[in-house]
């Protein structure tokens, strides 16, 4: 049995899409276990670019089984559009290769409206959400009023649950926000149509995954976002509403923790962040601009420019610890090409006191001054390099120094956006 979990080791946008695509080709089952269409990654295959938000990237391989787990919140409209877009590009999406958990919660228009109104009401203190209704959907799940895929498949159950929810939501829209609510019949009929279109894909994916694992299938779990956006372990409250850490795979897919063999942490060769929140190594100068433009650091889902900074070892050691990362995949090493000097944040200082562990307090994190170690850069184009030995000397020194500081070895190094622009240091 080989069960591998891929997690982002920073604030998301680490390049998990490419790494997942590479490993998906070598797996038999690919699973999403948390998040919704607030996440997104871009995969390039045979010169065609695919932007995926809900469906695992294994869908690009016709012989793989792709699973949307119970921990994912599903907007049926967004999912159906993604299916149609893939089919339009010649990708087969059918009940044999796409499975949706009957326990996954469903995103409704009122969730999206709640998201928008709540963010607007926070003014300058908004969290910078994608306004896709993800947080409000997870909140309904926690409040035990959420509607799941299995409910959507049963017209009578769905009718009763939607009716109760709309009465409650419409009252909130009117009394608190002075806004119009939603028409019951319109949502009911629209979502009944969605239900029939999605019905062939919906099943008990926990049983499916258990049986596949017992058969010895190679299973790959792909997390969305990153460790520092985790609801518990991220920079709260500037976090997502789910658990991108490796432990989230057990809850979000219904597999036991003892079934996980490997955890691969994906880390960019520098650091980026979308939206608000503290960022100790952020660069608000020409180097930050260089990284953003050369690395094309703009959100797949929102198009928002990402904040850029140097790599942060305190953060990476933290991610390794809370997810039990067994190896790392380094991405966008090529983006650093052309920089004369490259800095590595090896620790923080608060009022002269050295901080070695990532703080829980946002107030403390805001006060953290990065302690830097400077290394020589390189000017050679590395996109054609396929072995570690062929990298420029300073690039090799940089990678080796990161391994020493983090205490975990790299198994994959990405040197460009294309699938083949990859150095593989370990067989999977």
UniProtKB/Swiss-Prot annotation:
Name of this protein: Adenylosuccinate synthetase
Annotated organism of origin: Caldanaerobacter subterraneus subsp. tengcongensis (strain DSM 15242 / JCM 11007 / NBRC 100824 / MB4) (Thermoanaerobacter tengcongensis)
Entries under SMART domains matching the protein = Adenylsucc_synt
Cofactor annotation remark: Binds 1 Mg(2+) ion per subunit.
Q: Upper lineage ranks?
A: Bacteria, Bacillati, Bacillota, Clostridia, Thermoanaerobacterales
EC top class, as a word: ligase
In which pathway is this protein known to take part? Answer: Purine metabolism; AMP biosynthesis via de novo pathway; AMP from IMP: step 1/2
What's its catalytic activity? IMP + L-aspartate + GTP = N(6)-(1,2-dicarboxyethyl)-AMP + GDP + phosphate + 2 H(+)
Q: Which family does it belong to?
A: Belongs to the adenylosuccinate synthetase family.
